[in-house]
C-alpha cells in the first residue's frame, strides 16, 4: 500500500506527540523542583526568619553539651569515588502526576501515610518510579532499591510530584522483588503547612519533612538568596518541641527534636567564597533545625556530583558549635501559625 505524504506526516506528528508525552512522564533524578520556591508556604517553619527570635535560657548549656569546639560538617557531596554506587547526601526524584502509585509495607504502619488505619493494610499511594528498583543513586546511600541494606543504612527515598506539588518521603526502603518495604513513610502537601500529629514520626525522626531542609546545589549557585533553614543532626536528643512531632531520645542536657540553632550575626563571613557565604547567611537568618540523631553538627544536603568537598569541608569546618545560639524552644514567628496538627495519612476506603 502506498501512503500519502499527508498520512506519513500525520504518523510522524503522532510519534512525536507520543514521545513528548513519554518524556514528560519520565521520572527525573534531582529534577527541577516545582515553584513557587522555597518549598512550603512562606509561613512554614522551614522558611521562618529567626534572625530576631529570642535566645533560649539554656542556649549556652545546650552548646556546651554538643561541645563548643565541635566543627560543622557538610553531610553531602557526590559519589564516594568516581562511578561508584555509593553517594553522599540525599538524592531526590521528581515525577509527574501520572506516575503510578505503589503500596508500601511499613514497620511503623500506625504512623505512616498510605495505610488504611482501620485494617492496617497498605494501599497504592507512593509514586515510586521503577528506576529506583535497580538503578544506583536514586536512594540515599546510592545502592539500588533491590539491595537490602536496611540494617546498616537509613535508605531514604524522596519523591516530588511536580504537577500537584506533593512530597512523599520514605525511610529504610527495600524492594523484595514483589513489593516495596519501608520503616515509615510520610506525605506532605507543599501547598499548605500540614504538621504531623503529635507523637507521630515521618521519614525523619523528628516528624518533619526532609527535602525542604537540604542544602541544594541549584540554590547555592543560583542568583537568589537561600530562604529556608537547614536540617542538622546531633548525637543525642531529649524529647521534642514545635515544629517537631516525634521524639527519639531522652538524654538529659541534650537538645530536643525541633530545636533551632542560629549562626551568630556577629560571625564574620569575610574570606569565605561567595557560595559559602550564601549558605552561612541562611544559617544566620533561618538557622538549623534538629531533625535526627546522628553526628553532631552535620548539615544535610543533596547528593550532587557537582559539589566540591575540597571546598565545602574546610569551609564548614571553620565554624564550630560555639558560633551558634539556640533560640527559644518551641518559638513560632506568629502565635498560632501554621495551625493545629493536620492528619495527612487518611486514604480512600479508611
Which residues make up each language-model segment?
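Pro/Thr/Ser/Gly-rich low-complexity, intrinsically disordered linker/stalk tracts
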Residues: 336-350
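Bacterial N-terminal signal peptides
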Residues: 12-21
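Short, surface-exposed polybasic-aromatic patches that bind anionic ligands, especially phosphate groups
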Residues: 27-335
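Intrinsic disorder/low-complexity segments in short proteins, especially the signal peptide
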Residues: 23-25, 349
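Intrinsically disordered, low-complexity segments enriched in polar/charged small residues
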Residues: 8-13, 350
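Low-complexity, intrinsically disordered regions enriched in charged/polar residues
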Residues: 23, 40, 338-340
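N-terminal secretory signal peptides that target proteins for export/translocation
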Residues: 1-6
Amino acid at each position: 500500500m502506498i501512503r500519502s505524504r499527508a498520512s506519513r506526516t500525520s504518523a510522524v506528528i503522532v510519534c512525536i506527540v507520543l514521545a513528548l508525552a513519554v518524556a514528560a512522564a519520565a521520572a527525573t533524578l534531582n529534577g527541577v523542583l516545582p515553584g513557587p520556591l522555597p518549598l512550603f508556604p512562606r509561613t512554614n517553619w522551614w522558611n521562618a526568619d529567626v534572625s530576631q527570635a529570642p535566645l533560649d535560657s539554656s542556649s549556652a548549656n545546650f552548646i556546651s553539651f554538643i561541645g563548643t569546639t565541635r566543627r560543622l560538617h557538610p553531610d553531602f557531596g557526590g559519589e564516594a569515588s568516581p562511578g561508584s554506587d555509593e553517594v553522599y547526601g540525599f538524592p531526590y526524584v521528581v515525577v509527574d502526576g501520572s506516575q503510578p502509585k505503589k503500596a508500601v509495607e511499613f514497620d511503623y504502619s500506625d504512623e505512616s501515610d498510605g495505610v488504611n488505619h482501620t485494617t492496617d493494610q497498605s494501599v497504592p499511594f507512593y509514586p515510586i518510579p521503577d528506576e529506583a528498583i535497580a538503578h544506583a543513586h536514586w536512594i540515599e546511600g546510592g545502592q539500588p532499591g533491590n539491595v537490602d541494606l536496611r540494617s546498616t543504612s537509613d535508605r531514604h527515598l524522596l519523591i516530588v510530584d511536580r504537577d500537584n506539588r506533593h512530597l512523599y518521603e520514605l525511610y529504610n526502603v527495600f524492594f523484595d522483588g514483589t513489593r516495596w518495604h519501608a520503616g515509615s513513610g510520610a506525605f506532605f502537601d507543599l501547598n499548605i503547612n500540614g504538621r504531623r500529629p503529635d507523637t507521630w514520626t515521618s521519614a525523619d525522626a523528628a516528624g518533619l519533612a526532609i527535602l525542604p531542609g537540604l542544602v541544594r546545589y541549584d540554590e547555592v549557585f543560583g542568583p537568589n538568596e537561600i530562604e529556608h533553614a537547614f536540617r542538622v543532626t546531633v548525637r543525642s536528643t531529649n524529647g521534642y518541641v514545635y515544629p517537631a512531632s516525634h521524639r527519639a531520645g531522652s538524654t538529659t542536657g541534650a537538645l530536643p527534636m525541633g530545636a533551632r540553632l542560629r549562626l551568630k550575626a556577629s560571625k564574620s563571613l569575610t574570606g569565605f567564597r561567595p557560595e559559602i557565604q550564601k549558605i552561612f547567611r541562611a544559617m544566620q537568618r533561618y538557622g538549623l533545625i534538629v531533625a535526627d540523631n546522628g553526628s553532631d553538627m552535620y548539615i544535610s544536603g543533596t547528593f550532587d556530583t557537582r559539589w566540591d568537598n575540597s571546598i565545602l569541608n574546610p569551609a564548614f569546618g571553620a565554624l564550630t558549635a560555639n558560633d551558634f545560639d539556640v533560640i527559644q524552644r518551641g518559638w513560632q514567628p506568629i502565635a498560632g501559625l501554621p495551625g493545629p496538627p493536620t492528619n495527612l495519612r487518611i486514604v480512600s476506603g479508611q
